[in-house]
């Protein structure tokens, strides 16, 4: 979650410099739940609050930054998931994928994937929305890159270029 926040702050700062209006759901390491007596209830509240922000303005475009993890360490590379509810989501996902591939990961052959019902935020977003899994923290080499400030800047820039190519 620290990596997600570091990259998302860099992305928001960059997009602001390029003239985009940005809004981050969180700028520090804390959830955005408003209710719940246990972890599950707080997680549900957190997701509903995020979705409410996403869908609050039809002009919003959502890029949610995440990291991937798998039981085997051989997997690497950015992967982008997109909401099935807005056709612009697929275009945004593909543009980000191409940008990251061109600038950072020329050997990355991962394709964009339409989110299934298990990805609550994308399943319920009405605005263009993507989740960008920047890399695999279960891959030692990639995890080291993701922790590097310069690499984070490059990742944020590649994602920003992907957005700017569509919007």
Language model: regions and residue ranges:
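Active-site-proximal helix/loop segments of hydrolytic enzymes
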Residues: 2-167
